[in-house]
């Protein structure tokens, strides 16, 4: 299983990383996409949506099931990856390139997991 060292993670199987504009990108992990199977639909939170850490903010659906996206941190959504509306299967092919939404954190990020901590969570 692929767990890049340069990303941070949540217990709800999201990865996050800062982008060059000071916002953060969020997507689902390789583990999550593997459990879901073939992804057919992504409902990302709309730009301007207020995020509350740990609360549902979107949805990923596969041929097997649907899974809520949980906000990684408090903040505000700044953009969504429009390409995933047309080709959601990109998440299966490249989970760490296929970001779902970007957001501006309300405060300095805390409570995120390192790659080693996420790996330990998975067992």
Swiss-Prot record:
GO terms for biological process: glycine decarboxylation via glycine cleavage system. Residues 23-104 form the Lipoyl-binding domain. Binds 1 lipoyl cofactor covalently. InterPro entries: Biotin_lipoyl, GCV_H, GCV_H/Fam206, GCV_H_sub, Single_hybrid_motif. Its cofactor is (R)-lipoate. Keywords: Lipoyl. Gene3D superfamilies: 2.40.50.100. GO terms for cellular component: cytosol; glycine cleavage complex. SUPFAM superfamilies: Single hybrid motif. The glycine cleavage system is composed of four proteins: P, T, L and H. Belongs to the GcvH family. PANTHER family: GLYCINE CLEAVAGE SYSTEM H PROTEIN (PTHR11715), GLYCINE CLEAVAGE SYSTEM H PROTEIN-RELATED (PTHR11715:SF3). The glycine cleavage system catalyzes the degradation of glycine. The H protein shuttles the methylamine group of glycine from the P protein to the T protein. This is Glycine cleavage system H protein. It comes from Methylobacillus flagellatus (strain ATCC 51484 / DSM 6875 / VKM B-1610 / KT).
